[in-house]
Design a protein with these regions (language model features):
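A beta-rich soluble binding module of mature secreted/lumenal proteins
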Residues: 2-5, 24, 34-200
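Bacterial N-terminal signal peptides that target proteins for export
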Residues: 4-26
């Protein structure tokens, strides 16, 4: 045991240790690049954020009708988002959804800030301290009844609406707009809304 301790604490590393350190450095570098890509706050190529945009009209409760799959919402049903404009110009974000695997409602609270003028629907959102990701309203109903949102890439996309369901013709039109922007609409997950959220 003492010999092993001295070996681990030695300033001279073995070839195996050097190999492991090099592998760790590569993994860390790859992770940093991945985080940098995910943390982009600019609209992806081909996507233009809606302008003019009125955050006072946009705030309030939205239901998530469809999304592309990603780890932080995987398996969730009855997903909703509530946006509240703050006095400092930021937007409070509360995302909620039901996790069938655990039988529990889950909630994530974040903060969104405009990346430029508040009349352009391009924001950065954070749920994890200093790490931000892009949130861009790419299409919006004139009456603010539905919205198509794209993240830092077109691999992140959501269709939101004020109601749990919208007319099929309207749904098809939104999907067509998403497809034109480069979103893989065949991969969209349509969210079920069968439960009453106790928070609403």
């Amino acid at each position: 045991m003492h010999t092993a301790a001295r070996t681990l604490s030695s300033t001279r590393s073995s070839p195996l240790q050097r190999h492991r350190m090099a592998l760790l450095a590569l993994l860390l570098a790859g992770s940093a690049l991945l985080l940098a890509g995910c943390a982009s706050t600019r609209p992806p190529p081909g996507v233009t954020a809606v302008t003019p945009f009125d955050v006072q009209r946009y705030q309030g409760h939205w239901y998530e009708l469809a999304r592309l799959d990603h780890a932080f919402e995987r398996g969730m049903t009855d997903v909703s988002a509530t946006y509240t404009a703050q006095a400092d110009g930021s937007v409070r974000v509360v995302n909620r959804g039901y996790a069938p695997a655990s039988g529990q409602w889950r909630e994530a609270v974040g903060k969104a800030q405009f990346t430029g003028a508040p009349t352009t629907a391009s924001l950065k959102v954070s749920f994890f301290g200093p790490f931000y990701g892009g949130y861009h309203v790419a299409a919006l109903d004139p009456d603010y009844r539905w919205a198509l949102v794209v993240g830092p890439t077109t691999g992140y996309a959501w269709i939101l609406a004020r109601e749990k369901h919208i007319a099929p013709a309207q749904q098809n039109a939104i999907v067509a707009q998403a497809r034109a922007l480069g979103v893989d609409t065949a991969a969209l997950i349509w969210v079920t809304h069968e439960r009453q959220d106790p928070a609403h």
